[in-house]
Amino acid sequence: MAKISKRATAHGGKFDRSVNHPLSDAIKIIKECATAKFDETIEVAVNLGVDPRHADQMVRGSVSLPKGTGKVVRVLVFAKGEKAEEAKAAGADVVGADDLLEKIQGGWLEFDRVVATPDVMGVVGRLGKILGPRNMMPNPKLGTVTFDVAKVVQEIKAGQVAFRVEKSGIIHAGVGKASFPVEDLVENITALVEQLRRMKPAAAKGTYMKKVSISSTMGPGIKVDQSSI
């Protein structure tokens, strides 16, 4: 934390923390602040006026980022027979069923997203305590429990990002890399925010989207003027 605070302080003179910046300006500042020796991830944090303790205010879903994430996503698919072959052909990194159960229970977690066909959810369900806390449990509402495994694998590989509101009412999502052109990051962030707007729960009261901010892995957070998105 000390390192992040020091970097944030060092970059403090580049922008006014109290101001909501137009999206393109905020991205330019973030890119200037991203001076680490690796290609930092650009993250969006959206504060929502929802109480996720209530099921009718849960915001959870996915969005396909038009310019991708810049990250190599390792996709694991639980499937058998023909569907397993379709998943492999679509680019899945690991495909299996019962054979993967013991491997994952033994601590192997070298994957980022999980997809499953409905007929093997009995196997996958036994991994709930492992996959659930990591937000990797396949879910029909997210489209990750499906027989159309090839389509879903391709979408994930192309830049689909899953999100889920936290207990604090905040959604975090990686939307690209610091090396991305400003225009590409604008497109990706706009796609995410528009998706969240479409998903406003009917039970949500008051202001739905309270604050939008962006940051890089090691940089400070910058507030974004929502009217610019």
From Swiss-Prot:
Q: List the disulfide bonds.
A: none
Q: Name one Pfam family in it.
A: Ribosomal_L1
Is Ribosomal protein among the key words of this record? yes
Q: Which GO terms describe its cellular component?
A: cytosolic large ribosomal subunit
Q: Does the keyword Ribonucleoprotein apply?
A: yes
Entry-linked SUPFAM superfamilies:
Ribosomal protein L1
Matching Gene3D superfamilies: 3.30.190.20, 3.40.50.790
Question: Self-association or partners: how does it assemble?
Answer: Part of the 50S ribosomal subunit.
What the protein does comes down to: Binds directly to 23S rRNA. The L1 stalk is quite mobile in the ribosome, and is involved in E site tRNA release.
Record's protein name: Large ribosomal subunit protein uL1
Which organism is this entry from? Answer: Magnetococcus marinus (strain ATCC BAA-1437 / JCM 17883 / MC-1)
- Provide the organism lineage as a comma list: Bacteria, Pseudomonadati, Pseudomonadota, Alphaproteobacteria, Magnetococcales
